Every structure is written in structure tokens, then in C-alpha cells.
Design a protein with these regions (language model features):
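Short glycine- and Lys/Arg-enriched binding-loop motifs that mark or flank ligand-binding interfaces
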Residues: 11-14, 26, 51
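A short, exposed loop/beta-hairpin motif centered on an aromatic-Gly-Thr core
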Residues: 24-33
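Hydrophobic alpha-helix-in-membranes signature
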Residues: 21-23, 68
């Protein structure tokens, strides 16, 4: 059965960090976005194998992702 996971990529000093939204333990880094994608896919495969071996429930993908806009300079101080 095919599951789709949502990946988040963040630019870091050494390249890119990739992490799955639905499975935050699946995280990796690469020198560029392509390497990071490849390594994230490999990390996901390894995590699926580890979870199966430990008889743990594999998190399902398919999260709903949306951006939440905010004008940071318009936010006042809290009480």
C-alpha cells in the first residue's frame, strides 16, 4: 500500500535539513536539496524497517499542510 508523507526542507549552513511532518523522527541532512531528498527517502525506508521489526505502528502520511500568514511587526506585546 502506498503512503504519501509531507516533507519539510529547511536551508541550513551545511546545505538542507529534511524532516517528515507526520513522522518527525525521520530527519536528515544533505549538501543540496536533491541529496537531502534522497537521504530523507532512505531514512524513511530504514525507519519503516525498524518499526516493523519492533512491531510498532507506522505513522500514516497525508497531513493537511497550510501556511498561516502573519504581519510580525503588527503583533503587540502579551499581557
Amino acid at each position: 500500500m502506498l503512503h504519501n508523507y509531507s516533507a519539510k526542507y529547511t536551508k541550513i549552513a551545511s546545505g538542507y535539513m529534511g524532516q517528515l511532518i507526520e513522522w518527525p523522527e525521520v530527519v536528515t541532512e544533505g549538501k543540496d536539496i536533491e541529496e537531502c531528498r534522497m537521504m530523507l527517502r532512505d531514512a524513511l525506508n530504514e525507519m519503516v524497517l525498524a518499526y516493523r521489526e519492533q512491531r510498532k505502528e507506522i505513522p500514516l502520511g497525508g497531513a493537511l499542510i497550510e501556511q498561516v500568514p502573519i504581519e510580525v511587526q503588527d503583533v503587540g506585546q502579551t499581557a
